[in-house]
From Swiss-Prot:
Descriptive protein name: Small ribosomal subunit protein uS11
Gene Ontology molecular functions: rRNA binding; structural constituent of ribosome
Source organism of this protein record: Synechococcus sp. (strain RCC307)
UniProt keywords, alphabetically: Ribonucleoprotein, Ribosomal protein, RNA-binding, rRNA-binding
A Gene Ontology term for the protein's cellular component: ribosome
Pfam families xrefs: Ribosomal_S11
Amino acid sequence: MAKTAKKGPKKAKRNVPNGVAHIQSTFNNTIVSITDTAGEVIAWSSAGASGFKGARKGTPFAAQTAAEAAARRALEQGMRQIEVLVRGPGSGRETAIRALQVAGLEITLIRDVTPLPHNGCRRAKRRRV
């Protein structure tokens, strides 16, 4: 006879009006994490978690879908206003920001926090296709 798994306590619903949306956009995927002001993750989603596989994860539409899913979960927690921090060179940057706005979150600030080396490690060799 199969054992039934015990269900743990559900995550408590918090009322967090303000937060920060971290959008990490690479050429292969887009990850959206929505945190409170202290940095505690409230909701997250990615293009892969939204059902896209392979090269489709890097598309703007996949980024839009991921941002909508994360925004929906954040709105359930009572979030209204967010600051947006964008990191990376991917194609889903603008679409993800637009999707957060359309979902009903008021964007107060957009900041690009892409890390730039001050002549650090040597770059990878150029691809010859």
